[in-house]
Amino acid sequence: MKAQLIDRLSRYVKIDTQSNPESSTTPSTEKQWDLLRLLQQELEGFGLETNLDDNGYLFATLESNVSFDVPTVGFLAHVDTSPDFNASNVNPQIVEQYDGKTIKLGDTGRVLSQETFPELKKLIGHTLMITDGTSLLGADDKAGVVEIMEAVKYLIEHPEIKHGRIRIAFTPDEEIGRGPHKFDVERFNADFAYTMDGSEFGELQFESFNAAEANITTHGVNVHPGSAKNIMVNAISLGHQFHSLLPAGEVPERTEDYEGFYHLMKFEGNVEKATLQYIIRDHDRESFELRKKKLLEIRDDINVHYEDFPVKVDIEDQYYNMAEKIEPHPYIIDIPKKVFNDLNIEPNTAPIRGGTDGSQLSFKGLPTPNIFTGCGNFHGPFEYASIDVMEKAVQVIIGIAQEVTHHHK
């Protein structure tokens, strides 16, 4: 299967599908349609019924081959790639039997080394797909797309493998946080699903952050600095004061595991007006609410010293910890755990320090944990995919399809 995985992933990553957070359309970029239409064509070539809607959501169905009712399971992956780095002219490179030595990424001066990326030590002997250093690879999440396609193809070619009804979804704009926004859960009509959008071998994730975005605006009074005493209010200084009142250790670079944080994404402005953009993250809902409350308290503590309340805070929730919706249905995790065990894969159920489409879909009525794809160093030139781990991910999808038949409706 390795050759098929390499061929399919190479073809898909060469199609530029970068999303654009500045766009208001869905998909956010026209070029995402290029891969979506190709996938529709290939799925129909498998003999599947498909539907590609006006918003770029591609659904397909592999019908059940058993005579009794079992739950409908879904598998999802997103077609867009991150806007954080160049995604055009992707030139994938293959490293056979990775020996652990430093790999030069083309002529860019960039290298892939175990010193910088110690997780590579686990991949010695694997076949890797890497970049030439000039672009991201796009294995996030085209590896997931490939794994679903190859698993479906295998099930079609091996009708002796029994499975229930399987729904497939390829979606746009996950990288800019909009993946599930126009996902029609009712039309998808699955009982539960799995996103193939994880990273390291063995990941089985059903806990995500609670997430919000906060925009802070500070308003100043700008006068000539030579006569500014007791008159000038510097909006930049107010912004700095606001940030300094947050806990210094509760930032991404100083937290791990279940620890939440405030992350200052952008700070810009002048004496008259400044803006600070934060993301707020915490796995615990109560702690998450307290973090948002903290921002409002800081606002009030600063504003009390001014007549015109110069600090404004706007907070918008983005998604919630999907464990709230998945844990009441333990079989959704028990099924892949059984498959992992059968394949001698040690499950890593550590919480996601982020979110997936499943975070939002779970709250829309489709409980959706996340499974590994075998890729790493997403969103930049050091991105890689282990073809060996991708092969295991395909086996997991096939195994889940089989295992679901033991859970009658």
Curated annotation (Swiss-Prot):
Its cofactor is Zn(2+). Signal peptide: none annotated. Zn(2+) 2 binds at D140, E175, H379. Binds 2 Zn(2+) ions per subunit. Its main location: cytoplasm. GO terms for cellular component: cytosol. Zn(2+) 1 binds at H78, D140, D197. It holds the Pfam family Peptidase_M20. The keyword Protease applies. One of its GO terms (molecular function) is metallopeptidase activity. The keyword Protease applies. Keywords: Aminopeptidase, Cytoplasm, Hydrolase, Metal-binding, Metalloprotease, Protease, Zinc. Its EC number is 3.4.11.4. The active site is at D80, E174 (proton acceptor). It catalyses: Release of the N-terminal residue from a tripeptide. It is found in: Cytoplasm. GO terms for biological process: peptide catabolic process; proteolysis. Cleaves the N-terminal amino acid of tripeptides. Belongs to the peptidase M20B family. This is Peptidase T.
